């Protein structure tokens, strides 16, 4: 284990020994990336790392949120009565149209079924 602060060591232990959510934040240079890499390297949990953009995903050693969960590049409008996506120049997804995007292959389904730790990096 790299040299981690007591707080970082506690966080790492907490992540590995519980199923609780953790929100890690801090200013630049406080060790967030170091802790993230240590979590990835040492966790016994089935882990997936995602990020909102391609560059962030590459830097974190993961994939984009959209590609992991096969999300469309469109705004989601939960109340389908509010908008008709064909009448706008921008693409919208509704409850009735978004389901067509969730056809995952067997491998990706198994990854999600077995997922124990999801790391979302900015």
Spans of model-derived segments:
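Conserved ATP-binding/catalytic motifs of P-loop helicase motor domains
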Residues: 1-122
